[in-house]
């Protein structure tokens, strides 16, 4: 079953899309944040059982070439519109591996940013 999250005034997102939007909004609100600071905020540990991946991956070629690495699906948002840049100029992408358990900490960041959202199953 999929969970849909509605961000006030913006419509619905899947869990993975919501995480991407949270990171994008964080980067927009805090544009001077370095990549290391972003990695500290968006901890790899949040991924829990998917923590073999990075939450924020700066090796975009590796993220895009998942088939060549023998993976069965992409682990990152790699469309050009989803490649983000930290305050110190590091390009990075966001992991897609989110479920109802590991998204909780990321939603906490959204709440700290003042976002209003609801969870619909």
Give the predicted meaning of each segment:
Residues 1-121:
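Intrinsically disordered, charged low-complexity linkers and terminal tails
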């Amino acid at each position: 079953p999929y969970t849909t999250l509605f961000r006030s005034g913006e419509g619905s997102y899947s869990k993975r899309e919501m995480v991407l939007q949270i990171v994008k909004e964080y980067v927009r609100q805090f544009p001077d944040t370095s990549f290391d600071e972003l990695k500290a905020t968006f901890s790899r540990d949040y991924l829990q059982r998917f923590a073999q991946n990075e939450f924020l991956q700066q090796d975009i070629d590796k993220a895009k070439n998942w088939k060549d690495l023998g993976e069965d699906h992409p682990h990152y948002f790699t469309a050009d519109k989803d490649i983000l840049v930290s305050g110190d100029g590091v390009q990075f992408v966001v992991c897609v591996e989110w479920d109802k358990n590991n998204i909780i900490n990321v939603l906490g960041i959204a709440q700290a940013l003042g976002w209003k959202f609801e969870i619909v199953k």
